[in-house]
């Protein structure tokens, strides 16, 4: 999941070197924290949060297929 999220985020932003994903495992599953450069935040979130919602949907769908629970948090 982490690699998929990195791939998607790096292809959306102008500064792909600033993209990082931190994976945290807790009792409810995995949390992927996505960090991007401040100037790229709008590109990852999108108009009315549409891109962020689609990123979360894709990751959640792939995780469910693999029997996992994964959530994505976009942090600044």
Predicted regions and their residues:
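RNA-contacting regions in translation and RNA-metabolism proteins
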Residues: 1-43, 53-76
């Amino acid at each position: 999941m982490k690699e998929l999220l990195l791939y998607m985020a790096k292809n959306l932003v102008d500064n792909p070197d600033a993209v990082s994903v931190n994976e945290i495992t807790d009792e409810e599953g995995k949390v992927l924290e996505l960090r991007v450069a401040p100037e790229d935040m709008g590109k990852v979130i999108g108009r009315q949060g549409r891109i962020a919602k689609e990123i979360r949907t894709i990751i959640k769908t792939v995780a469910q297929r693999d029997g996992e629970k994964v959530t994505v948090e976009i942090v600044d």
